UniProtKB/Swiss-Prot annotation:
Cystine pairs: none
Protein name, UniProt field: Heat-inducible transcription repressor HrcA
Name of the gene: hrcA
Pfam families in alphabetical order: HrcA, HrcA_DNA-bdg
GO MF annotations in UniProt: DNA binding
Keyword Ubl conjugation: no
Keyword DNA-binding: no
Keywords: Repressor, Stress response, Transcription, Transcription regulation
Length: 339
């Protein structure tokens, strides 16, 4: 544990470095810390913090900058996020953007608003589409061709064209969809397949044929995995901390292109409550030392279905980004739950 004096100086150093992007010297710390300490005393404290691995001194400057470990201590124990007028503006902007509609479009809009408000990259783990259905409907297209319409609990509407061995009348299709909705809604199609095997003797042959065709056609519709949407990644080209080194920049866009590490990070954060902060060089889940990711899970009807976040430099204004992520997650949850 740091003593109060060391905590104050470390907090001041990180706040000044985030604001100005330059190594922080003893004169700046004396001016902004509110402590009446001599330059020699401040330098001694800085030496102690350096030994603890919380700050380092770049070769080109007498000032110091925080390490990933220093940032971790800062966000865990020193960071204060207080309500402000900016938070009201964020709330209005997110509400305006996240209008009820098709869930996938709402989720994509959330990634966009995260990027626009933070001026970094917005990222979102889209929910795994449900293996269960809420409602289905059959529409006759022509002889032996039927449109299968599947509505999932999340509100997604998915269509498949079915080819059948025989023709069905519109009344037969209505009867079949009514039976399936009454007896099987809320189940997975695998469960429907199992139940059909058990109940096959109780059903007419044409009904069984149609339902088996529906189960077969629906398999690839409902079995889609999680995907990562990224918005505004080019904004990071304007962040010197990330774009000044070409090798680092290539690695950054490899992360965006392959998405594997982001998928793993977002999946981990979906199991936690509230805002999580992952700091490069401190978390194995962040592949670039100069990069941080601020995440929060979002819900549908009280159940966590995905994660969203902001990707930016380690030197970001966490007290500004955290409310953006938190508010967006809460309002996205509300919007999706109203579908």
């Amino acid at each position: 544990m740091l003593d109060p004096r060391a905590q104050t100086l470390l907090k001041t150093l990180i706040e000044r470095y985030i604001a100005e992007g330059q190594p922080v010297g003893s004169r700046t710390l004396s001016r902004y810390s509110g402590l009446e300490l001599s330059p020699a005393t401040i330098r001694n404290v800085m030496s102690d913090l350096e030994e603890l691995g919380l700050v380092i001194s770049p070769h080109t400057s007498a000032g110091r900058i925080p390490t990933p470990r220093g940032y971790r201590l800062f966000v865990d124990t020193m960071l204060t996020v207080e309500p402000s007028a900016d938070e009201d503006a964020v709330m209005r902007a997110v509400k305006t953007t996240l209008q009820p509609g098709e869930p996938q479009k709402v989720v994509a809009a959330a990634a966009s608003v995260l990027s626009n408000l933070s001026q970094f990259a917005g990222v979102i783990l889209t929910p795994r589409r449900s293996h269960v259905f809420k409602q289905i409907e059959f529409l006759r297209l022509s002889d032996k061709r039927i449109l299968l319409i599947i509505v999932t609990p999340e509100g997604d509407v998915q269509n498949r064209i079915m080819a059948t061995q025989r023709d069905f009348t519109p009344s037969q299709l209505v009867e079949a969809s009514n039976y399936i909705n009454a007896h099987f809604a809320g189940l997975s199609f695998d469960e429907v397949r199992r139940r059909l095997r058990e109940e096959i003797d109780e059903l007419r042959g044409d009904m069984t044929t149609l339902m088996h065709a529906a189960v077969t056609a629906s398999t690839d519709v409902t079995d889609t995995g999680e995907t990562v949407l990224i918005s505004g990644e080019r904004k990071l080209l304007e962040v010197a901390d990330l774009s000044s080194d070409m090798a680092r920049l290539r690695k950054l866009f490899d992360v965006f292109d392959q998405k594997t590490s982001l998928l793993q990070l977002l999946d981990v954060s979906s199991h936690a409550q509230g805002v999580q902060i992952f700091i490069g060089g401190e978390s194995n889940l962040v592949p670039i030392e100069e990069m941080s990711v601020v995440t929060a899970p979002y819900e549908v009807n009280g159940k966590i279905v995905g994660t969203l976040g902001v990707i930016g430099p380690t030197r970001m204004a966490y007290n500004r980004v955290i409310p953006i992520v938190d508010i967006t997650a809460r309002l996205l949850s509300m919007t999706l739950s109203q579908q």
